[in-house]
A protein has these predicted regions:
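Short, solvent-exposed loop/turn segments at conserved positions within beta-propeller repeat blades
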Residues: 31-41, 80-83, 136-137
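Short loop/turn segments immediately following beta-strands, especially the blade-tip
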Residues: 87-100
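Short coil turn/linker residues within repeat-based beta-strand modules
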Residues: 49-51, 82, 92, 105, ...
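C-terminal closing repeat unit and adjoining cap/tail of repeat-based domains
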Residues: 137-180
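Beta-rich, blade/repeat-based domains predominating
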Residues: 7-25, 30, 42, 53-74, ...
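Residue-level marker for isolated small/hydroxyl-bearing positions within beta-strands
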Residues: 28, 78, 134, 175-179
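A short loop-to-beta-strand structural motif that recurs across blades of beta-propeller domains
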Residues: 1, 41-44, 84-86, 140-142
Length: 180
């Protein structure tokens, strides 16, 4: 185990991870759900050699998918419970520029909140900058532009599309996981 805590506070439920070009990583800590309560989550940045971890965003409700824009200037976070996608401008190593309250819930720009009964899960960013988010209940992948517009919804038979990543030599093949 590389990290178990940050500043004396235990990690509760690390979930998704994205590496930057320097080999450092950002990750979501979703927390835990119990019968009558749910933890507030956090976003962390860490060095892959185990020497430094920073809590970057806290509190944030059910942070799940995480990704970086192709130029690594924007950090994307998918909020599961609300089905929202946020973008945070990266201002330095392990730092984001936060939009002040009341203009933002968590400090990020709300990019997409289409509404309806859906939840966002994991995400991957295309080479062109579009954010592809596994979408629960509606069963598909929501393709969202960097400005927040829904470009396309790719429907699958399974209602629980939980993860997506790109692979193959040209990184144009999408691999998804479904869990229903």
């Amino acid at each position: 185990t590389l990290y178990e805590e940050c500043n004396g506070i235990p990690l509760k439920g690390p979930n998704d991870i994205v590496f930057d070009k320097k080999g450092n990583f950002w990750f979501t800590d979703l927390g835990k759900q119990r019968e009558r309560e749910i933890d507030r989550g956090s976003i962390y940045w860490a060095k892959s050699d185990g020497s430094l971890i920073k809590e970057v965003i806290q509190p944030i409700m059910t942070p799940n998918g995480i990704g970086l824009s192709p130029d690594e200037k924007v950090l994307y976070i998918a909020e599961t419970e609300g089905g929202k996608l946020f973008g945070f401008d990266i201002s330095g190593e392990g730092e984001v520029q936060k939009v002040p309250f009341p203009y933002s819930i968590y400090g990020g720009k709300l990019l997409n909140n289409e509404g309806g009964i859906k939840r966002f899960d994991s995400l991957a960013v295309e080479k062109n900058g579009n954010i592809c988010v596994g979408t629960l209940f509606t069963g598909g992948v929501s393709v969202i532009s960097p400005s927040g517009d829904l470009v396309e919804f790719i429907k699958f038979e399974d209602p629980y599309i939980t993860n997506i990543c790109f692979g193959s030599k040209d990184l144009k093949t999408a691999y998804i996981t479904a869990s229903y």
